[in-house]
Regions:
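Short beta-strand-to-turn element immediately C-terminal to the catalytic PLP-Schiff-base lysine
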Residues: 1, 91-92, 108-112
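Gly/Ser/Thr-rich active-site cleft segment
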Residues: 1-81, 208-212, 240, 244
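Glycine/Thr-rich phosphate-binding loops that ligate phosphate moieties of nucleotide
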Residues: 18, 25-26, 52-60, 78-79, ...
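Generic recognition of flexible, low-complexity loop/linker segments
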Residues: 65, 74-77, 87-89, 95-97, ...
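Short helix-loop-beta connector
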Residues: 72, 94-95, 263-266
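Short glycine-aspartate micro-motif
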Residues: 74-81, 90, 97-101, 107, ...
Length: 364
């Protein structure tokens, strides 16, 4: 049709990005919008007044596109949701297990039965929306602004001399490019191997991971990172180790926020590129968090999750949990925390929080 008011809106985007809350009547009232700008007076009346989960059909494939793609016009089109939320389903999320999609940044998701969340409002996260991940459960989202990007930043920093090879009179341009690419491609792997051999001590180099601000807990994108405990003996592997630990401390701050707000975290589920590619980082994550992290088999959890929702919307499964059980690929690796290292990391995490508080206080 051509009536925008008939378009079915997904609760995932509406709840996490448009302030939709059914228990408060849906979208914010008109007074809210007009208080932001008089031009927004009446804006609310042009928006939607209902939402749907990703397990429900939005309608059927338009005849034009059906003919163009050689498909049936009876193909059901499902309601949309955010990539990582579908990825959490593709990664077989379970109640009270923190599902972490780890790539350039992280998206951390947790689900809990709606009946167990009554009266609980989690401060400082990125949204708490009924049905945004699994229908019938409360979907909660958090995340880090930089995760893989933090490691990429460090690689770029160390690679600066390599960028100057093109000006060398000793090698030709093609050799310079090949050499630069080879070293750059191996750098994170080599740094990880060396960092894994380093002893762990309370006085080691310490990094705050806010290289792209802080998303959770308590979003503040203007905050910046910091490094302490540097000395003349600090080498590239030691500093890389600090950056990795900093990102894992940032991850622990998210888990602790849920726990402090009365939401248990029973374990971790690792998804995404970093989870699949870096055993060193995942072991540090397990040690810092002091809980196991299961790595899902599939490298395309978002696509698998979308397929699970599509199968549910099409009626192949009664509920998305059934699709998860039938279509899920399971886990291929479990990283278990080392008790001795976890005890040291508990002390270093306290130092991380102290340094972070100082940095944030200095900014304020």
């Amino acid at each position: 049709g051509n009536d925008i008011h008939l378009l079915k809106r997904g609760v995932c985007a509406a709840g996490h990005k448009s302030l939709w809350a059914a228990e408060f009547g849906g979208l914010p009232p008109n007074d809210f919008f007009s208080s932001l700008d008089p031009l927004l007076d009446g804006f609310i009346f042009r928006l939607f007044n209902g939402t749907y989960t990703a397990a429900e059909p939005a309608g059927y494939l338009d005849r034009y596109w059906a003919e163009k793609w050689g498909l049936s016009a009876k193909v059901i089109v499902g309601i949309g949701a955010f990539d990582c939320h579908m990825g959490a389903v593709g990664g077989q999320i379970e109640p009270y297990y923190l599902s972490k999609v780890m790539g350039t940044s992280t998206c951390d998701m947790l689900v809990a039965p709606a009946g167990e969340m009554k009266g609980k409002w989690i401060r400082g996260i990125c949204g708490q929306v009924p049905g945004s991940i699994i229908p019938g459960m409360i979907g909660m989202e958090a995340g880090q602004s930089a995760f893989g990007d933090a490691y990429a930043w460090y690689r770029t920093l160390l690679s600066w001399p390599l960028q100057q090879l093109h000006a060398s009179s000793l090698i030709d341009a093609a050799t310079a490019t090949a050499l630069r690419n080879e070293i750059s491609d191996r750098m994170i792997v080599n740094l990880s191997r060396e960092a894994a051999t380093l002893p762990l001590d309370e006085t080691d180099e310490l990094a705050i991971d806010w290289l792209n601000g802080r998303r959770t807990p308590d979003a503040n994108q203007l905050l910046t990172a910091a490094v302490s405990n540097l000395n003349l003996g600090t080498g590239a592997p030691q500093l890389f180790k600090a950056v990795v630990e900093g990102t894992c401390f940032g991850a622990k701050a998210i888990a602790d926020r849920f726990i402090d707000e009365g939401i248990p975290v029973k374990g971790l589920i690792g998804l995404g590129g970093v989870a699949k590619k870096s055993p060193y980082i995942m072991q540090v994550m397990a040690d810092v968090m002091n809980m196991p992290i299961r790595i899902h088999k599939t490298e395309q959890t978002c696509a698998i999750g979308a397929a699970m929702f599509a199968a549910t919307a099409a009626g192949l499964y009664e509920k998305v949990e059934d699709a998860m059980h039938a279509m899920g690929q399971g886990f291929d690796t479990v990283y278990v925390p080392d008790p001795l290292r976890s005890r040291v990391y508990a002390k270093r995490y306290s130092q991380y929080k102290q340094l972070g508080a100082y940095i944030e206080g200095s900014y304020n």
